[in-house]
C-alpha cells in the first residue's frame, strides 16, 4: 500500500512538472509571437499610410505608372495584413480551447492539401507546386482549417524567404502517422536560424521583399501541430533548398486507451 501511494505521489508530481513545462513553453511562444506581431503589423501599415499619403498629396504630379505602382504596393501590404490576421485567428482558436488542444475529426488529407495549394497558387501563380499523394484516401484526425493554414504558411515561407520557383508537397503514411512534407528548391534556411525556426523570433534578412518576418508563420505552424499531438521540423536539403516535415497521428484522441 505504501509503495502504491508513493508511486501515485511521484506520478502526480511528474504530471504537474510536465504541465508547468508545457505552460512555460506556451508562454514563451506567446511572448515571442506578440513581439513578432508588433513588428509585422507595423511594417505593412506604415507602407499603406506612406503610399496613400503620396496619392493624396501629390496626385497631380504623379504619372499613371507611378499611381499604379503605389496602388499595387498598397494592395500587397493589405494582403499581407490579411494573412497576419489569419494566423492570429488560428492561434486564438487554439489558445481559447481547453489545454491548448483542438477538436479533431477524420478528414481527407488530400483535400486539405488541395485547398492549401489552391490558396497558395492564387497568391503566387508563377510558382510551380507539385503534389504527390497515396492512391488510397488518407483520413487523418485534424482540424482541417488549421492544418490548411500550416501548409499555406510553409509554402508561403518557401516563396518569400526561400525564393523558390518550385514546391513539392508530399503525403505519406509512416507507421501510425500521416507525414506531410513541403520541400523547395530555394536558398535554404540560414544556419543561424535552424535552432529557432519555430519560436516566433526567427527573422530572415533574405525575404523577397526584404522586410517580412518568418517568425509568425512558423510559430503558428508549431503551435497548431503540437495541439494536434504531432511534430514539425525544418532542415536544409543536400541538393539545395529547404524541407519541412509535419507528422500527425492517424489515431484520434477518442481511440486512445
Predicted regions and their residues:
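Conserved micro-motifs of the catalytic ATP-binding
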Residues: 96-102, 139-142
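Short alpha-helical Gxxx[C/S/T] motif in the catalytic ATP-binding
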Residues: 217, 221
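Short helix-loop "hinge" at the ATP-lid/N-box region of the Bergerat-fold HATPase_c
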Residues: 158-159
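Conserved catalytic submotifs in the C-terminal HATPase_c
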Residues: 103-106, 128-138
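Short helix N-cap motif at coil->helix boundaries in the Bergerat
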Residues: 109, 188-196
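Short alpha-helical segment of the dimerization/phosphotransfer core of two-component systems
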Residues: 76-82
Amino acid at each position: 500500500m505504501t509503495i502504491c501511494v508513493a508511486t501515485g505521489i511521484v506520478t502526480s508530481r511528474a504530471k504537474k512538472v510536465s504541465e508547468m513545462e508545457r505552460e512555460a513553453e506556451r508562454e514563451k511562444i506567446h511572448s515571442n509571437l506578440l513581439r513578432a506581431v508588433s513588428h509585422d503589423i507595423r511594417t505593412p501599415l506604415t507602407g499603406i499610410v506612406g503610399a496613400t499619403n503620396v496619392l493624396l498629396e501629390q496626385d497631380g504630379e504623379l504619372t499613371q505608372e507611378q499611381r499604379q505602382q503605389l496602388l499595387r504596393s498598397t494592395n500587397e501590404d493589405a494582403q499581407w495584413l490579411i494573412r497576419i490576421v489569419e494566423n492570429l485567428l488560428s492561434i486564438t482558436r487554439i489558445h481559447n480551447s481547453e489545454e491548448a488542444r483542438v477538436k479533431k475529426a477524420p478528414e481527407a488529407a488530400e483535400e486539405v492539401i488541395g485547398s492549401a495549394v489552391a490558396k497558395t497558387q492564387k497568391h503566387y501563380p508563377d510558382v510551380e507546386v507539385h503534389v504527390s499523394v497515396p492512391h488510397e484516401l488518407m483520413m487523418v484526425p485534424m482540424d482541417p482549417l488549421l492544418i490548411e493554414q500550416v501548409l499555406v504558411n510553409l509554402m508561403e515561407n518557401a516563396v518569400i524567404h526561400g525564393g523558390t520557383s518550385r514546391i513539392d508537397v508530399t503525403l505519406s503514411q509512416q507507421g501510425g502517422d500521416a507525414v506531410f512534407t513541403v520541400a523547395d528548391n530555394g536558398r535554404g534556411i540560414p544556419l543561424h536560424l535552424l535552432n529557432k525556426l519555430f519560436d516566433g523570433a526567427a527573422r530572415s534578412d533574405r525575404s523577397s521583399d526584404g522586410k517580412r518576418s518568418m517568425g509568425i508563420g512558423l510559430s503558428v505552424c508549431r503551435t497548431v501541430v503540437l495541439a494536434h499531438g504531432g511534430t514539425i521540423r525544418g532542415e536544409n536539403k543536400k541538393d539545395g533548398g529547404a524541407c519541412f516535415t509535419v507528422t500527425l497521428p492517424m489515431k484520434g484522441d477518442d481511440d486512445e486507451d
